[in-house]
Amino acid sequence: MLKNTILIGLFASNFLLFSCSEYEKAIFESVSLTENWTFQSENLEEALEADVPGNFTMDLMHHGLIKHPYIKAYASHLETGCEDVIYRCEFDFPGMHYPYQDLVFDGIDTYATVFLNGELLGKTDNMHRQYRFSIENLKEENNRLEVIISAPLNVLDSLVAASQFVLPEDFAHMRKAAFQFGWDWAPETPSLGIWRDVRIEGYEDFRLISSWVETQAIQDESAEMMLVVKLDVKTETELKLDFQSDDFYFVSQTVSLQAGEAVLHFPFTIESPELWYPNGMGNSFLYPAKLRMKTDNGMLEKQMNFGVRTIKLRRDKDSIGEIFEFVVNGIPVFAKGANYVPQDAFLVHENHEALLQSCVDANFNMLRVWGGGIYEDEQFYELCDSLGIMIWQDFMFACALYPGYNQFFDNVRQEVQYQTDRLRGHACLALWCGNNEVKNAWFDWGWQSVFNWSDADSVQIWKQNTFLFDTLIPDILSESGVASDYLPSSPVWGWGHDESLTEGDNHYWGVWWGEEPFEAYRKHTGRFMSEFGFQAWPTQKMLDYMHDGEVLEIESDIMIAHQRHPFGDRLIRETMQQYFYIPETAVAYGQMSQQVQAFGISEAIRWFRTQPKCSGSLYWQLNDCWPAISWSSIDYFGEWKALHYAVKDAYAPYMLYAVQVHNKLMGYVVSDAPENRDVMLSLEWFDDEGLLVFTETKRIRSEAYNHRSEFVLDVPQSLQSNTGWQLEMKLKTDNEILAKYTYSPKF
């Protein structure tokens, strides 16, 4: 199709705003189709009411046909991925009279055939894409929409059978959320459904595909901005476009459009801009603006909030290797956060507000949206914009090798284009990443020998995967002018490689998978720690829900069903014994598991923050998709585990730490607060009976954004002969305690 690119400039200046009343007719209308749905499978004699958006498994549960998969061990008995399901909706449709009408599905999971009034509209094969079908045979009454969704496991069997190669993970053959096929924190739930919004859209001369604002450059007193509007133009037309806030016209222009896809660029300048900053660095300010587009047939209006900021991933060479550091508005940032996974195994229950507020409350400034889940909805990213949570966005590829045929690549191409168009304008978006652990797996997991590939097959398999992540995806980003940086694979090096400590990001799993003690984090600190973690039980509230009246036991069928890691229970128990003790009751055992997790991971975070070479800490994982024994700091109910409280202190703007380094007790003061400040460090030494032995103070000038100071702590002579003493560290101003830390030589 014809692609028009238009560049028109205007300085933002004060004007009186025009009244919307001059545009009385809308040239776009959207009508929801999320009501009056039924579903029927081959095992159901009659159709039953369905939830849309929703999921087949949850529909069965709502009708009492299966037990809730999250209770007891019922998830082990699910068999909902093996039957086709028909979703039907009958609706009347009077009143929409536009020359162009589309039926739009924002998400179908996954392989579906769509009929409207008996006419085949098309098929779907990617749950990560929007599907749009042109419709012409709507009736005012008694329209019948049918979506026949194929059983995912049956489709998968046919795809695997047709594959040129035996690939390590079958799920790689389909564009469906990988975690639904089971992970070491998630149940096997390969279900199906219409999982996002469905609607009919009507429009006149054009359809707005997407619009966004990018920051081109920030100078001392101004910011150079770019409004980009992407249109599907149906007929040659003249378009009057206005982009404005309550105080400013940013853009006001008239352009002539030809039929085809048009990408319009409108540069503008904001004088004395208020900048967007991540949480803890300053205000996450968003300019509220409206985009209005008028033709002779009427007007379309869209609310657009945008931030003025630059975010770059700095990867310069240095004396150690290569820096891996995010820089926001010219200021280096230590990334503080975690890895985010889908909030529900069936993608039906999400509470973005509460979960993201918990991130802010724990002093996060970044989340990594992990590549085995989903691209989140608009509300998620809008909240991250307003809360100041930067997003490291994986594309949805994880822990697998992917097929290399053209149809698969074309499918991915459309997915990437859709998602980047949708998300690129968010102030929170810091990085696009091609995948999770694909490169790591290829070089370190031994798949070549496990699957007995020939040398020629190995070359071809790796070639098609490097094409996917090193060519296809970055080429789309480049051709589309995506400003955010791109990383082909995370981690850059696996945790067994020396390079993982000197360049790129690091998934350090020597602790846990390698069964190393927590102290190993101090020997294996990389430039950016993007995965590390340790498991614990969920909260008591979650345990009570899982057991549904049955007695909680340390080892039971229920607990085994909710522990997805092959040696997780053993490792929790052994580590508990190593650092603390093993309680006798199940309630105390669960609480102690949380204390172990909180101790180990918060100690690691504090250490990472003291190391000048390290620029980020994203622990595994923030949240759960179901009631689980897992690495999360917040359980499925949104309840904080002990780790989240510990992380709140470890990620605080001011942080203290003490640790034995080369036979010396070292003390650290770290701050990323956005202001210079004179503070006082108080050191109180207590003997093994809790008696105060010695007190000293140090005055420190804390520098804005990136302060680290370290010093030797001299243990009082009277305490050197035993290990029962404690050091209480406090960082204070005249009227405020900024940070605390307790050190004990026992640990």
Named regions from a protein language model:
Residues 1-12, 17-366, 610, 639, ...:
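Secreted/periplasmic carbohydrate-active enzymes, especially glycoside hydrolases
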Residues 132-136, 148, 153, 165-172, ...:
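Active-site mouth of glycoside hydrolases
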Residues 123, 387, 394-395, 620-627:
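Active-site-proximal loop/short-helix segments
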Residues 337, 371, 393-395, 433-436, ...:
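Active-site proximal loops enriched in glycine and acidic residues that flank catalytic Cys/His/Asp
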Residues 31-32, 41-45, 179, 186-193, ...:
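Substrate-binding clefts and catalytic carboxylate motifs of secreted carbohydrate-active enzymes
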Residues 76-84, 345, 370, 583-598:
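Short acidic-aromatic active-site loops that bind/stabilize oxyanions
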Residues 110-112, 154-155, 314, 342-345, ...:
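Flexible loop/turn segments at secondary-structure boundaries
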Residues 107, 124, 394-395, 438, ...:
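Generic detector of well-ordered alpha-helical packing
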